[in-house]
Amino acid sequence: MMRRLAYLLVPLLLATAGCTATAEEPERPAPATRAERPSPFADCAPLTVAPAAASPTSAGKAGDQLPDLTLNCFTGGAPVNLRDVKGPAVINVWASWCPPCRKELPAFQRLSERADGRFQVIGVNSRDSRGGAQSIGEDYGVDFPMLLDQGDAFQRALERNAFPLTVLVDADGRIRHTDATGALDDARLAALLERHLGVRV
């Protein structure tokens, strides 16, 4: 009796195992990694168009033009030559591994939200990984245009080896001021814009 029962159960178990082994489960899409996510930053195309409400800069003494240097945009698209950037503009050079850079980024984001077409806020991510920049952009809600300088060509051209670095550019594309004093806050940024670009925020 037991032997007969075993003969009946063995084929049934084999059939069940065969169904389990050969049945194909539908593939589930892999979760998107940070590198595959859309860029948090804005496109760079508007950087070569003058801000709609910009007025001629009258404060202070004009300096050198921005360097003849072409940088890629974080979002892709056409690279941007810094000589083609239309001011007034505030350029923030930063890296994800730099604590003062991370500290001041929210102030630059708020500044970009208060620009009202009078000036541009531009980021230059330098000596950094793309993933690091993407993570900070997402975590801090930074969405102004971002250029990539994976070396330090921009800083070398300015002869300023500092992080963070802020560059104020007038409507004629000339550098009015560079600041390497550390993390800037809202009040300090507002004071710099009024003093060097004649813009109140």
Region roles according to the model:
Residues 1-68, 72, 201:
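N-terminal targeting signals for export/organelle localization
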Residues 7-18, 89, 126, 140, ...:
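Hydrophobic alpha-helical membrane segments, chiefly transmembrane helices and signal peptide h-regions
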Residues 64-66, 85-88, 116, 141:
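Extracytoplasmic
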Residues 74-76, 171:
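Short, ordered coil/turn segments that flank beta-strands lining enzyme active or ligand-binding pockets
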Residues 79-102, 108, 121:
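Short active-site neighborhood of thiol/selenol oxidoreductases, capturing the structured segment around
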Residues 102-140, 150-156:
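Structural microenvironment flanking redox-active thiols in thiol-disulfide oxidoreductases
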Residues 135-142, 150-201:
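Thiol/disulfide oxidoreductase modules built on the thioredoxin-like
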